[in-house]
Structures are given as structure tokens and as C-alpha cells.
């Protein structure tokens, strides 16, 4: 790809595809904002209270319309923020342009950027000398710890959005290299129950359909992994008429999948049966040579985990006599036997490579968690030991309350009698 040179707009540095795309980006950011009432209320409060005044912040996220609303809220709160992409294929170039042109937020992200550019953008962001990091997959946090040790003393904390990133943070903590607090946004109830399940389920199928235009009814879809993302993907595939097989390594989750009505088997048994394969595990080489060898001619494989490692594309490429693009985000690998296997989105997140990511309504809660986690870190600066912290229950519940309010839904509350009963141990049979 051609790398766009770093440009300056009234001393604002940025690296995006085309700033003239800003009007389209603004329209779409505002449209997304209509479905994000919680982030809107947080932004309005931040604008008055300025909790991030004097704070330098890096946000490493998918550069989407929803992320834009988060970035705007953080800037309203006084943050000196820089935004970079957390995936080379997930950037929406018109959104990046709007954030630079209309909101003065430095963005370093181009859809389709190569790995060298992606990692250079991480370094540029770290040159901002952040106090707070919003991470999505852990790349910025890991790079800071490995290559920028002299900057660690300035870090108040980091927040992490993904299962993959939390796994990496736990490994950092185990190795004794995580020397500041990290907020586990991924495991907040108002995040994983909705973003991971309903968001991933809908957006993954959206990306697959946009990339291929295949009819899912009657197809056999193999979902690798039955965490919240896998549950959502399996549920939505079944809703579109697919016969769904689940593969798992966790016995409890496998039982859950069976009792939810899905067939469960090892990947080597599912491989000859599947028409479409979706990996949502967060692990490496879930689909590998022994699976490719027994797949049907024309089988489609894609990933909706975080990194492009779940499908062993290097091995598939070595087996292929020809690789050609047959549609946007759709590559056909022809093997020596004459059989073809179709890979979507270069094995990267199909929901962001070929579609627009999760719907705004679920990202509203996820990004509310990010914003309030950042505020929590600032309020508790110097009070938290290095480690991984869950989102406080009161913040989680407040986000849920605000979301219900935005949806026009009210719920019951405990009566004094019920509260007394729940706090008593003397009443029995």
C-alpha cells in the first residue's frame, strides 16, 4: 500500500487516508450518536466537570463511528487524546477524517495499512507520552512495557476492551512486568453480556454476508469457541436457518452448547461437514493444516476473534498453488488437489474488515465503561496497586440504569419489606 505522509493541520499532526472524506464521517458519527444515549450523558457531564484536564491519553481502538463518539466525549472532558487503530483493516476512513477536520483529534489510522505502518502508528502514539491508555487487544500496553520502560512512571493506568487483551494483561501480571493498574472493561456485565454476545453475533454475520452474499439457510456453520462471542455467533447463524456445530476445549461450555441445542464435536470431525467456519476463540491456529486437508471444496473460513492468528493462513498459503481475490475481502486459495478454500478478510476481524463492526446501541455501553473506567483511574491515581481490576459494580449498574432510561424502560425497586428480608437471617421455613 502507499503510505500517506504525516500531515499537519494548524500544528495538528495526523495520518489518515483523505481529509476530504470528513463530511461523510460526520453524518455517520452523528447517526451512531443517536443510538448512544449513555455516552452522550457522560459527555455532557464530562464537558462540565473536565475530569481529564491536563491528562494525555492514547486510545487504540477500531476507528469507527462509535469510537468517534467515545473520543469526542473524552476530549470534552479535557483529555489531550490521540487515536490509533487497533486493527489494520478496521478503520473507517471517513470517520478518521472527521475527527481530524471537525474535532481536532489527532488520528493515525488508514484502512488497509500494512503491519509496518500499524506498528509505526503505535510508536507515534507512545511519543505522545500518555498518562492513560485505552487498549483493544493490548498492543499499546505491551509495546510500552517492552520498548518504552522510561515512560511507565507517567502511566496512571490502562483500560482493556477485549478478551484477548485481558489474557495478555494476565500474562504480563504473572511475569511481573505489569507495573500499573489495568481496568478490565471486557468483563463488565454491561459489556460482555451485550457487546460480546449481541454485538459479535449480529456484526459477524453482517460481515460474512457483505463479503460473500451467501445464503446461510441450510448451510452447516462451524463456530469455534462458545464464549459470549461464540454464543452470539451461533445464535444468529441458527436464526438465519443454518445448521450449527460448535467446537470447544472447555467441557462446561461444551455442555452449555449441547443444552442450547447445538451439535458439539472436535474440529477434525467438524471440518469435513462445514460450509462456513467462524473462529471466536482468541487462540492460535484453531483451524490448521489437518483441518484444511479434509474440508469441502469451496469451504469458507473467517475469524471474529481479535488477531489474525486463529486460522493458520501461512500453512494454507504454502499448500496453495494459486491465491486470488474473488470479491472484496474474499480470497480463494486453490490447493494442489484442485480443491479451493475461501478466506474472508485476510483472517482478521470479519465484522470490521467487511462490515461496520458492532451496532451503536451495544457499543454505547462498552464505551461508557471505557470512559468511566478512565475517570475511575484518574480519581484513584496513586491509590491502586499494579494489577487487573474489574469495573466497580456501582459503575456497571449506573451504566445499565442510564441505558434503560435511554430506552424509555423503567423497572421495579425493592420495597422496604423486601430489603429487610434480604438483610435478615432469622426468617426461614
UniProtKB/Swiss-Prot annotation:
Its cofactor is NAD(+). It comes from the Bacteria. InterPro entries: Adenosylhomocyst_ase-like_sf (IPR042172), Adenosylhomocysteinase-like (IPR000043), Ado_hCys_hydrolase_NAD-bd (IPR015878), NAD(P)-bd_dom_sf (IPR036291), S-Ado-L-homoCys_hydrolase_CS (IPR020082). GO terms for biological process: L-homocysteine biosynthetic process; one-carbon metabolic process; S-adenosylmethionine cycle. It catalyses: S-adenosyl-L-homocysteine + H2O = L-homocysteine + adenosine. Keywords: Cytoplasm, Hydrolase, NAD, One-carbon metabolism. Pathway: Amino-acid biosynthesis; L-homocysteine biosynthesis; L-homocysteine from S-adenosyl-L-homocysteine: step 1/1. Its EC number is 3.13.2.1. Gene3D superfamilies: Adenosylhomocysteinase-like, NAD(P)-binding Rossmann-like Domain. GO terms for molecular function: adenosylhomocysteinase activity. One of its GO terms (cellular component) is cytosol. Belongs to the adenosylhomocysteinase family. May play a key role in the regulation of the intracellular concentration of adenosylhomocysteine. This is Adenosylhomocysteinase. It comes from Gloeothece citriformis (strain PCC 7424) (Cyanothece sp. (strain PCC 7424)). The gene is ahcY.
